Amino acid sequence: MGKKWFVALLMVVVMVCACWTGVLAEDEERETFTSGDYEYALLDDGTVEITGYNGKAERLTIPNMLNGKKVTSIDNRAFYWCDSLISIIIPNSVAKISVNPFAYCSRLKSIFVSSEHPYFFAIDGVLFRKADSCLISYPKGKEYTIYNIPQGITAIESSAFYDCKFLTHVTIPDSVTFIGDCAFSLCDSLTSISIPNSVTSIGDCAFSLCDSLTRITIPDSVEQIGTNPFAACSALKSISVSPDHPYFATIDGVLFRKADKALISYPAGISSSTYTIPQGITAIGDSAFDSCDSLTSVSIPDSVTAIGDYAFGDCSNLTLTVPRNSYALEYAKTNNIPYTYPDANDWLNN
């Protein structure tokens, strides 16, 4: 199966990010309308939000009016899989764009807004939001191998660099404090990225499936880390933090959170076939061991009382070594994962 299941899961995560900001329940209930190639929904103030585009244009100028109503918002899924788009112009009427709506536009090279746009600006075809100095969308069809995020940018939006396969190096300035969910997911040529000592939060799966990353260092400034941000990074061999990091620790390149003694990320590029989780660890995070193909055995101590979703996803060769009458034993049974006891004389394979 390889990583196909995790890519599918990641696409769901990206869509959930989009739905979260758009409030999916409301989207399902509200009525949508059509104007030419556009689908849109009415907002409470009488303006409209573009919810879909069905055209095949390569160079698209989004209208500022649809059926006589002002376009003020672009839904986060409006331009998904618009593979014909090469460039797009966003009108001054648009006031709201949250999660990258162009994440699946495989040929998109440039996003443009006017220099007088009240809410957004673009530099070299990359889209930013003025209010919070946030990078929203780096077009995935751009063929640059190196990109330097401008100084002064404070946030990288969820999915901002999603699946940008040409990039080998991204420089993040020390003005950035937030890296969103899936921000660099599937950037599989990315060999080097330095997280500055200004970042305080790293979102779910932020660097997942970056198959060329071999090492990464988390600075002392980082206070929050979501679901394994390095899941399924097949070449990643080590995660580093300083010995004095206030919130996180690493042992043999494996990342732990101090507050709840949780194992967050086991690098998928570690070549060892066996791993013993340290005694005293109480939790294994979501996707913590994702796509660790080389592992054949993980020993879980009786101190572990919580194991997250997909913690051992796509570990096809894995057998868990678990204590009798433990939480880990029940987890293995429930999830149909082969297991054995530490004495190795009582084998079960349910």
Predicted segment positions?
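Short N-terminal segments immediately surrounding and downstream of signal-peptide cleavage
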Residues: 27-39
